[in-house]
Amino acid sequence: MAERQQSPAAETIPGTPVIREVRTGTGSENFNPENTRRGCLRAEIDISPQLYGGRGFWVPFNLEDNYDCVGEFDIKRMEEQTVELEKDLIMKELETLDLLEALGSTKRIFEDLKWQLQQQALRCKETPQHLRSHSKEMVDEHCHRNPLKSPDLMTMEMKQAGMNLCKTMDDLALIHSYAESLNMKTKEEKDVLGVASLAEELNSLKFKPAGPDQVERFNTENLPVNPQCEQIKMVVETYDTAFHKQSKTCPRTADMRLVAARKMEEAARAAEALALAEMTILSSRRNQDALCFPKTPCFPLTLKAQMNKELSTNVSRIEILRKLEEANEEVKQSKQALEVALNRVEIASVKQLEAEEAFRQWNIESWKDQKAVGAKRSMKRESFPQRSFLSHINQHEPLIDLPEPMLKRNVSMGNALNRKDEKQLVTPRRKFRFIQTHQASIRKTE
């Protein structure tokens, strides 16, 4: 029968399915499959520990601890867990491959046994009776030494192996899903951290002055003295001053407008409160007149007195309503002023950002142009040979400061003819001297 050994990997991790290795004995002693990874081993997963109760899917025990705190995640811890899950996946895949190879080996053994049985049946039909008895004895001895499994047992083992494979595949799918969820959460956290870091950098760029590196990078004092460089320097200084003034004035004006809008809103609220207080005072006076003061003797009022009384009451009501309307209008105006101030603040911030970007781009372009001019000058300097008589001119005198060409004097025809005659007289003398020296050198050698 088969010998079963429990794997050490299953013993170390609590709550995991037990993996066992089964050695199967073949019918023939000389049969050894070459393609199997562990010889004739077959892995078997036992899902009958006390925790499962006979059935259930395998879930890694570390995930329960992780899902206790849903709101707080540690990125390093999540990455370590993903690495461990990937290792578990690799182990499970290797186990499934071993199981598949074991299944293939068992199928081959089963086919070999069938073929051997068929061959033995054919030989028994062909051999005589005195040899049949001898072959039967040999077969019985071989069966006693190496007992063969019945085909029913083989089919049962195959079915059990198929069930174990299905369970392992389900476990692998669960582990894949957990790993994907963890990866998604880590990605989301990384994105959130990246957005926060970008926001902090933008805030630091907005409210932090320019560092010494940028000042040294775009400093124009170290450049050679040229009219173009001086013009660039003047433009940079003017642009810097204008930019700083604009950046200072825009927030100040926005703050002033905000303060004014808040004061207007406070004034409107105070006016509304005063109107409400007057209304309450008038109503309380009427009630006090009705309750506290003793009744005066009632005399029949004339029509004029009644008309005056009604007019005074109507006038007081109209004044109160007018004050309420004015307070509402002031509140609306203050709200509009607040909206306008906020819009101006937003526009000023956008303009400030655009000005910063334009200033940076302009500085970069000017720096690139200066670099290109320096490269051209260096190329022109390298074009002259080291021993040429123009090297000192190229080193000390820039191309821009070269002297302007002067107008030549008017030369008469007589002077030009005299110069030509002098040139013609000088040239044959030089040739004659050269010939004489050459003949003297030849005579000395002879």
UniProtKB/Swiss-Prot annotation:
Q: Which residues form a coiled coil?
A: 313-349
What keyword terms does UniProt attach to this protein? Coiled coil
**What top-level branch of life does the organism fall under?**
Eukaryota
> What family is it from?
Belongs to the WEB family.
Name this protein carries in UniProt: WEB family protein At3g56270
Name its species.
Arabidopsis thaliana
